[in-house]
Regions:
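Generic beta-strand/beta-sheet core signal
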Residues: 13-15, 55, 69-70, 94-96
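Generic preference for well-ordered secondary structure
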Residues: 29, 36, 51, 67, ...
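Active-site and adjacent substrate-binding regions of carbohydrate-active enzymes
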Residues: 59-73
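A conserved amphipathic helix/loop scaffold
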Residues: 70-167
Length: 167
């Protein structure tokens, strides 16, 4: 209806500089494609009847109940600070594969992956492991039960000593 508005409670983070940097040839895998990540998430919520906004990682995220960064390979210090603020204020946040790997100059952050957000996530990638185009790995919970599969990409995660596993 003309003039009407929607108030989305879900946002997908989109940063053009990060998209461009992710898809350079020098990355560990050419299978990581921002468009695919975004469409997979968007399609899922659309089919369930949810309205979804696209938001820049530096904009105010406090109005959302759920913010998803399907991939945010390159993140400015301002974006990292803004994500911290959103999570600290109670926004639910999902961070996808190979995210917050480098700063705005494509420099690896001193201290390693997710150094500025490890305390909030309770985990970080210790090692990235791109898979072959037809490769897949099993996802298992702490009891060893199969809960899914991943194709194209895997990450070896390190948990914080006080982190609670909920999967």
């Amino acid at each position: 209806v003309v003039g009407s508005t929607t108030n989305s409670e879900i946002a997908l983070l989109l940063d053009w500089n990060s998209w461009w940097a992710l898809e350079l040839d020098s990355r560990p895998s050419t299978l990581l494609r921002q468009r695919t990540f975004l469409l997979d998430y968007y399609r899922h919520f659309f089919e369930l009847g949810y309205s979804v906004d696209f938001a820049h990682p530096e904009q105010d995220l406090s109005k959302y109940k759920l913010v998803i960064a399907p991939n945010l390979y390159l993140a400015t210090d301002k974006a990292v600070s803004n994500i911290r603020k959103a999570i600290s204020s109670g926004v639910n946040f999902v961070l996808g594969a190979f995210s917050i790997a480098v700063d705005e100059d494509e420099g690896v952050r001193p201290g390693g992956h997710l150094i500025d957000l490890r305390d909030l996530f309770g985990a970080y990638s210790e090692e990235w492991s791109p898979l072959y185009a037809d490769g897949a790995v099993n996802l298992v919970d702490s009891s060893g039960k199969l809960v899914g599969k991943s194709d194209g990409w895997a990450e070896y995660m390190k948990l914080a000593p006080d982190a609670e596993v909920v999967l």
